């Protein structure tokens, strides 16, 4: 896969039992998908879990799955500091390893006006600043 952008998402649930990559995967399988739609999942503690293999097209943003890396954090109320730092780590790795430009980071809402996901203003974050 050749990715040219990153799209950020949230699970839209603050229920602790939902903060699990396997729960998200099962939700997506119940929808008839063949796997979790996101390439990475970040839990409340900032732990990063692999989702759909990056060699496969995601299923996270209609009309943009072919060229985007999908990252989802657990929660509905905006990411905490640990989750933001984890996002930055993935974004910087995507830039270094996959040649994704750092100015090509979007929220799901950028591509679907009916969405607020990832429930924070992606444009206010300086993704170029160091992740560590």
What does each model-identified segment do?
Residues 1-11, 15, 44-48, 53-54, ...:
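Basic/polar, cationic surfaces and motifs that engage anionic cell-wall
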Residues 21-28:
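Short Gly/aromatic-enriched secondary-structure transition segments
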Residues 59-62:
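Short, surface-exposed beta-strand/loop micro-motifs that present aromatic residues
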